Amino acid sequence: MAEKEESVKLLGFWASPFSRRVEMALKLKGVPYEYLEEDLPNKTPLLLELNPLHKKVPVLVHNDKILLESHLILEYIDQTWKNSPILPQDPYEKAMARFWAKFIDDQILTLGFRSLVKAEKGREVAIEETRELLMFLEKEVTGKDFFGGKTIGFLDMIAGSMIPFCLARLWKGIGIDMIPEEKFPELNRWIKNLEEVEAVRGCIPPREKQIERMTKIAETIKSA
């Protein structure tokens, strides 16, 4: 009996770091998938049906399985398609990759986006506090090609989709050079390495379009 053909669909949004990181993993592993672009202000009935709880992207549909939340989707992809592993095999290194991923999506996103834009304590204070957090990642990637070592891994996908290809576009749009090379030589080297990875290049949002979008979001938050 012939094996049932696999079906992989990803509901995403071009500017979402959360769906872009899932695309990176699928491309890296060579998994054929159908990409369905969502218009987030006008969510499709399919998105509302598949993710009625959060009504957000990404949503991965693998045959009859529906998966939500980018970190969990990345782990599912890694365990389902074994080639080109993205999570460390060592239990401690795996736990630390998860720790830093949560640090990025919780602390750096919160401080480097909404808190910075609102700047209730002053913009310069918010900038320095954000840089203090980024310095932890600077130290973590020192001496490595990628956070994952010699090859791109789970943490590179989380950090890459969020920092250089999302938040940095916001910072650029509001006139902040958040990661100057003289302060963050290792992070800047890592970003250059990341941009050379084929699976990543195809998932980087258009720069000027992203800057324009992030700047508009910042203006909305600031005036709220």
Swiss-Prot record:
GO molecular function, one term: glutathione transferase activity
Record bears the keyword Transferase: yes
Keywords, comma-separated and alphabetical: Cytoplasm, Detoxification, Phosphoprotein, Stress response, Transferase
Domain GST C-terminal residues, every copy: 90-217
SUPFAM superfamilies given in the database record: GST C-terminal domain-like (SSF47616), Thioredoxin-like (SSF52833)
GO biological process: glutathione metabolic process; toxin catabolic process
InterPro entries: Glutathione-S-Trfase_C-like, Glutathione-S-Trfase_C_sf, Glutathione_S-Trfase, Glutathione_S-Trfase_N, GST_C, GST_C_Tau, Omega/Tau-like, Thioredoxin-like_sf
Residue span, GST N-terminal domain: 6-85
Tree of life domain: Eukaryota
Keyword Protein biosynthesis set for record: no
Record-annotated membrane-spanning stretches: none
Subcellular location: Cytoplasm, Cytosol
Catalysed conversion reaction: RX + glutathione = an S-substituted glutathione + a halide anion + H(+)
Family named by the database record: Belongs to the GST superfamily. Tau family.
Protein name in the entry: Glutathione S-transferase U1
Organism annotation: Arabidopsis thaliana
Gene (UniProt): GSTU1
